[in-house]
Every structure is written in structure tokens, then in C-alpha cells.
Amino acid sequence: MLLFTFFACGTDPDESSASKSNELLQPVTPSERLFTHEDVDGTGFKTAKEYDVEGLTGATDVLFGFWRPDGSEAKEYEIRFYPSHDVAVESGTAFADEATGDDAILDKDEATWKEGIKDRRYFFAGPIGTHGSGGVKAKYGGYVIYGNMIMLCEGANAAHSLDRCGALLAAMGADPLE
């Protein structure tokens, strides 16, 4: 009986460290700090590609690559840099909305900014034993605008993406309460 009581009084799954970090990190957070490519590199982030920013209004640099949060499985990120937080919000929000979530535009013919579109999508097969052809889904469930960066972070939904963005921001020394 005592053992049952111990487990029954255990941790609430809603009180995970991930959901606690979500309480601090907001999807849009102003910061006076201007982040650079070097800030990202200092975390152990592995840049796979640097995209041409032509057509991505206001952006100065875009990285695509992966990072391993706390030694876990590598997750993919697309990090867009802007001259300031205001420019990131004003010029980059619509592009980030278009590239993330269930309503992401993943067809090159329809996307506003086509560079790297293949890296923003997952292909999945139909169920085993069926003749289903599968489909395409957005790799990035959501994004964070933090200072002069827009980070698209791998995740099944916006909450997963926010957690992963938060982990990389913390590794960069960013303070969500600044």
C-alpha cells in the first residue's frame, strides 16, 4: 500500500521541465543582444547549409543544421538572422508562419521563399500492409523570434518546437526573462 501511495503522489506529467521552460520562453521575445552565426556555432551546432537570403525580406543570414540537446537525438533547426528584433518581427513573421505547423506551405510552386524548402519537410510512408502512398508534413511545428533571430525548430507541434528552441537558446546564453 505504501508503494502505491508513493507512485500515486509522484510527479505530475504536466509539470515536466519542458513545460516549465515553455512558461518562461515566449514565442516572440525582444532582446537588445544581436546574435550572430558565431553564437550558434559556440553551442556545438552543426551547420549543414547556409541558404541564399534573396527573397527572404530583411534577412542577413540563414543557417540550416542540427544540434543535440543534452546529448539526446539530433534535432534540425533553421535559424534566420536579421539586423534587429523589429526587422525580424516585421519582415520575418509571415515567412516563418508559412514554413511551420500543420498549415505550412511545403510546395515549391506555392511557397513565397523557396530556398531550403526540401529541408523543411518530412516524407512519411503509408501504413504497413496498405497501398497508401504516405505524405508530406512540416518538419518544424513552430518557431521562436528571439532578439534578431527567427528559429524554426524541429518538433511534432508548436510546444515541442518551443522546447527545442528554448534548449538551443539556453546553450547560446540567452535569457528568456531579459
Task: Tell where the protein language model's regions lie, with residue ranges.
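Short, solvent-exposed recognition patches
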Residues: H37, D41-H131, G135-V136
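C-terminal motif of bacterial Sec signal peptides marking the signal peptidase cleavage site
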Residues: T5-A8
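A short, solvent-exposed beta-edge/loop patch
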Residues: A111-E178
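Second-shell loop/turn segments in exported
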Residues: N22-P27, K75-F81, M149-A158
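N-terminal "mature-domain start" segment
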Residues: G10-R68, A159-E178
